[in-house]
Regions:
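Macromolecular interaction modules
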Residues: 1-99
């Protein structure tokens, strides 16, 4: 299984609407990727205002191939939604779940 973590740095003076991210943006991702290997998603919100990331979205896929096919098919529409909830540039980590 593959986990794609999209991490939004906690940058002073930047905007991040966690409610939009957790509902509308993640909803859009599910709409586009549920039939393309997306198994589930999680949204983490920083518990401490000084945390290095304000929020992290985790997307779980059956395989790297399914992630790549689904993501690249719908990347333009999903990334076009980012300005609706933030002006932070996200960092991405793709991991293979070992255990």
């Amino acid at each position: 299984m593959i986990r794609v973590s999209v991490m939004y740095p906690n940058e002073k003076g930047k905007r991040f609407d966690v409610n939009y991210f957790a509902t509308k943006h993640i909803g859009l991702i599910h709409k586009k990727l549920d039939g393309a290997g997306l198994v589930r998603s999680e949204v983490d919100k920083a518990a401490d205002p000084s945390s290095p990331f304000i929020a992290i979205g985790h997307l779980y896929f059956k395989s790297m191939e399914e992630f790549q096919t689904g993501f690249f098919t719908h990347a333009a529409e999903m990334t076009a939604d980012i300005p609706n909830f933030t002006d932070v540039t996200p960092q991405v980590q793709i991991s293979e779940i070992v255990k």
